[in-house]
Amino acid sequence: MTPLTPFGAAAGAVTERLRRASTGLRTSEEPRWAHVPSESITVTTEDGVALHVEIDAPESASRGRRHLAGRAPTVVLVHGFALTMECWVLQRRALVRHGFRVVTYDQRGHGRSGLPDLETCTIAQLGRDLDTVLGVTCPSGPVVLVGHSMGGMTVMSFAGQHPETVRDRVLAVGLVSTSPGGHDITELGLGSVAGRVVGSLGPGVLTRLSRHAGPINVIRRMGKNIQDAVVARWAFDSPVSPGLVDRVAEMIFATSFDVMAAFLPDIDSMDLAPDIVALTGVETLVLNGSGDLVTPASHSEQIVRILPGAEHVVVEDAGHIVMLEHPELVTEQLLMLIARAQRAVAEGVAVASKPRVRRTVQDISKKRRGRRGGREAAS
């Protein structure tokens, strides 16, 4: 029998905890991943990378719904590091039902988008990519920009590069589980000592791993317990279905190691504080999970300190990928953000003069479902 390593034992323990914790979750809580957009297109960036873009038109029954300040904005959802547009699937559906046109896309080197030259894997380039996507999919009219993790960095970088577009067209911004930089993000919640090792060795280690794709793919197939342990630790802070853990693991481990390695140094050294200033006067939601190990609350607090009038929402029992862990709650916060922004425009409210607000919210419905399911499983 092969001896069990300490990490293997820990992985097994985490997986068993996941199994027990998810016993109370109904199968209906497993997201329906298949989604048919109204339109799928390819947008080519300035340097020739093909980005996979999907557009959802509002449901016909919602098109006549009245929106404050006139025309309903297009909502653009931007995913994070080592994920794909799929992580926004539940918000896409909900926003469409509420009468919004939605644009999502896979960032360069992720999902169904093309692989770029590795030297272009920078946050500044992602900001330029977002500008290109906007120019093709919604060249006029109001927009709401929502970014998760590296997607939030993309939005901030775009704002710094295109302040005039922000001033003229951006109705609202959602920055979810993200960071302005300056926090040694590649510590990944490991602590200062271990984190410094990861921060210094991570990109090189990933690059070396990418040269041995065959063995790594074998590990991917055989190491499900380890994958589950990694995802459970860094993605979530409350019980989720095993299927959700599997799907997030698939997104992460399907991302090219070369691409991961190329982005990490730029993420670790970036400073987006000057870019954030361009969002002054824009209704902004800054949201993070209380148990986020990748971008803890201190990252969000730094953004809020720079941005007058921002609303800071902390979600209890939530990890880094909060929009999949607590989808209904995140959707509700996005709808509230858009409503606040539309009301501010209609009433002539100066957003920058509003007081900063910090709220802590909890997904009560999920807790109730978990308790109810646990009782049913025990009976």
Residue map of PLM features:
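Conserved alpha/beta-hydrolase catalytic His-Asp/Glu region
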Residues: 209-278
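Active-site loop/oxyanion-hole signature of alpha/beta-hydrolase fold enzymes
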Residues: 60-61, 107-166, 180, 186, ...
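Catalytic active-site module of serine/aspartate enzymes centered on a nucleophile-bearing elbow/loop
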Residues: 301, 305-379
